[in-house]
Amino acid sequence: MEKMSFGEIFQSIFTPLMIELGVLWQTNSISPSHEHFITSLIKQKIHSLCEKLQESQPTNLDKTYVLYLPDNEIHELGLLYLNYEILFRGYKTIFLGQSVPTASLSNFLEKYEKMVFVSCFTIEPNNDRVEEYLDDFEQEVLAGEGSELWITGYQVQHITNHKNPKIRIFKSSADLIKEL
């Protein structure tokens, strides 16, 4: 493990662990507190690494990443990890976290020229409301030039191609990271 990067550890150890914990939780083999405890430990590590990365000034200034979860979405571990990966590559990030109303995101457009909004749709918006959410996001946030929305997560796996080129759907966090 000493020779593995944090990204390699997250992808090869933490991600499979979290999937297994989810299965154990759904089958009542463990309680929610067990899953929350492990998640909390991983979050602490990611926060610590992000704090260290933010001690240095960003080196890639061509865009700013705003990471958020949509209303009623609370599963932020994947988003925290994406924040780490983006910071690791020298970009400026603004991490907003859980349950952020779409309307509040347009405020950032006044301060930054090129924004990439990043989100993970794990449980919200649910499958039958994703397209409506994307249409609303397009009208409320992406109407101007220079901004994009990058999404990954379970709820967008069924979308093969979105009509707006400013909205990019990734099958996995690893695919999103490759685009950084």
Predicted regions and their residues:
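Long amphipathic alpha-helical segments
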Residues: 1-52
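C-terminal regulatory/effector modules of DNA-binding transcriptional regulators
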Residues: 31, 37-180
